[in-house]
Amino acid sequence: HHSKHHATYVKGANDALEKLEEARAKDDQSTVLLNEKNLAFNLAGHVNHTIWWKNLSPNGGDKPTGELAAAIDDAFGSFDKFRAQFHAAATTVQGSGWAALGWDNLGEKLLIFQVYDHQSNFPLGVVPLLLLDMWEHA
């Protein structure tokens, strides 16, 4: 997964940056827009996978403690309710995407949401903490 899918997003982002520079030099606005879209997709794929790798642990799977446990209880009522909502978000992604847990800096609480494909449709002000890859290859 790391050497195939993740590496493809890194290469795609680098390629899009090169093509974007060329298109800007030629003042080719339609190609600029196309490559900005390609850059956003591939860069988001890279960032999402980078967070996902950090979430994986050979000894993981236990309930959180401390501030995270308190924030989960505050936002969802209990760890079991959090897990049920996160599971629902993950298993109902239409097509390809991600389930996400993020910290809302404005509301100062945890939120669960879906990310479609790799498009970083995180709500503004939300920092992703936990991502679960729900693409068919995952």
UniProtKB/Swiss-Prot annotation:
InterPro entries: Fe/Mn_Superoxide_Dismutase, Mn/Fe_SOD, Mn/Fe_SOD_C, Mn/Fe_SOD_N, Mn/Fe_SOD_N_sf, SOD_C_sf. Mn(2+) binds at residues 1, 49, 133, 137. It catalyses: 2 superoxide + 2 H(+) = H2O2 + O2. Its cofactor is Mn(2+). The keyword Phosphoprotein does not apply. It is an enzyme of class 1 (oxidoreductase). GO terms for molecular function: metal ion binding; superoxide dismutase activity. Gene3D superfamilies: Fe,Mn superoxide dismutase (SOD) domain, Iron/manganese superoxide dismutase, C-terminal domain. Binds 1 Mn(2+) ion per subunit. It comes from the Bacteria. Its EC number is 1.15.1.1. Keywords: Manganese, Metal-binding, Oxidoreductase. Destroys superoxide anion radicals which are normally produced within the cells and which are toxic to biological systems. Belongs to the iron/manganese superoxide dismutase family. This is Superoxide dismutase [Mn]. It comes from Mycobacterium celatum. The lineage of its organism: Bacteria, Bacillati, Actinomycetota, Actinomycetes, Mycobacteriales. The gene is sodA.
